[in-house]
Every structure is written in structure tokens, then in C-alpha cells.
From Swiss-Prot:
Taxonomic path: Bacteria, Pseudomonadati, Pseudomonadota, Betaproteobacteria, Burkholderiales
Molecular function via GO: protoheme IX farnesyltransferase activity
Major location (coarse): membrane
Organism of derivation: Burkholderia ambifaria (strain ATCC BAA-244 / DSM 16087 / CCUG 44356 / LMG 19182 / AMMD)
Protein known as: Protoheme IX farnesyltransferase
Keyword annotations of the record: Cell inner membrane, Cell membrane, Heme biosynthesis, Membrane, Transferase, Transmembrane, Transmembrane helix
Amino acid sequence: MQSTLSQSPGSRFSQYMALTKPRVTQLAVFCAVIGMFLATPGMVPWHVLIGGTIGIWLLAGAAFAINCLVEQKIDAMMRRTAWRPSARGEITTPQILLFSAVLGSVGAWTLYTFTNPLTMWLTIATFVGYAVVYTLLLKPMTPQNIVIGGASGAMPPALGWAAVTGAVPGDAWILVLIIFVWTPPHFWVLALYRRKDYENAGLPMLPVTHGEKFTRLHILLYTVILFAVTLMPFISGMSGVVYLASAVLLGAVFLAYAWKIYRDYSDELARKAFRYSIVYLSLLFAALLVDHYARPLLGV
């Protein structure tokens, strides 16, 4: 009975969807869409909004599918990822490669057709940065994998901005910098309470190579830097007081988590901090959007 169910169309679709890491993709695409809206004082043209969103989503999914393929043996050794269809051998290597190729090709065509060549090439470069540079080279070789590899994961706002304007100005790079600095503490709190998983899989995550205390200190330091970086949209004039108030409040909570982790660590606290870090980034970018359209009305 179970074998029959696993081959049903709905189940097969779910297996392929799992390869795209939907929750991670959703956050990345959300940040890209915010970048689109911040790039213009008015509304984003519908063909750009829809085409850009779909294209970025497809190429992100293609990159995550390659990641699942490369790490299928590693995923099988980790409780957090052992459920993935690639780790369980439910989808073959040729099937994953074909799936990724189709997603990537359709995504690139969509971006070229509905946005512009710059967006397509930047998104392809992001694909290569994540699927090849991070997954194949950085992650298995250095504890700084998240710091260096975070550059590709930080690109969505720039992709969205480029989709609308055909350029990536300084304000877009500020948004990229926010995600770039957010990435290490976000993943390091996960690595703290999943340390055994990473150790068993042979991955040189910071808690494995440098220990818990060193990692806790770096989480705190990066969170302090993140707090400062999130003030840059206000300082640059891109955003107003609505965003500033949101950034300070959200950042204060994140700092409180980082301080508690540094002073009195527990796995449960790290889990809460990890979940909050996702909420934090989502609300921070939502605040950018609200401020963008509320600012002219409020005159602040």
C-alpha cells in the first residue's frame, strides 16, 4: 500500500517540490519581490512582477535541487534532512538533474522574456554561486562556508531591483548587505543545536571546528553588526521612520536572543532564536515595503 501511495501523482509531485526547499525559496523570493517594489515609487509593472517572481522562483528551485543531489549522502546521515526524497533514494540522479535543468531553463527564459538580460544573468550567477561554489566547494571545506557563501543567498533583493530598473544601484546593495550579515547568525544558531548532525556528516560548521563558545561569541558579534547595518536604509535616505522604528525593535529582540545564547546557552533557546531569525528577516523586509508607500503619505 505504501509503495503504491509513493508512486501516486500527488506524492511524486510532493517529492519533486521538496527538492526545491519551498520554505527557503519562499523567503528568498519574498525578498526579491520587496526589491522590485522598492525600486520604483509607483507600482511594479505586472509583467515584470509576475515574470520576475516566477523566473527567480524557478531558478532558486533549480539551485536547491542541485544542492539536494550533491548532498544526498550527507542528508541521509542527518536527522534534520534524512526525510528528503534525494536522501531516501526516492528520486534518481538523472531525474534530479533533468528536473533542475527544466526549472533553470524555464526560469532563465522567463526572466529574459519578461524582465531583462541583466536580471537573467545575475540570477544564473546566483544559481552558480549557491549550487556550485557554496555547495561543492565552500560547505565541505571551510567553517567560513556560511560567511563567504552567504553572498549568493543575499542576492534576491538585487535581482528584484534589477528586474524593474535594469540596474543595481547602491540602495539595492544595502539590502543585499543586510541579508549577507544576517546569514551567519541565522545558520550558526541552527548549527549549535544540530552540532552532532553536522559532526556525524563530516561538515566543518563553526561549532564543530571551533567549539560552542567561539560560535556563541560570533553569533553575538554578527548580530551587533547586523543591527548597525539595518540602520543603513534610514541613513541613506531610502527609508523613513516607520522602517527605522521597526528595524530597532526587531533588532533589539534579535540582540536579546544573541546575548542570552552567549551568556546562558541551551538548545531550546537556539531553536527559538533560529525561528525568530526567519521571522525577523521577513518582518524587516515587510517594514521596508510599508515604509516605502507610507512615507509619502505621512511625510516622514
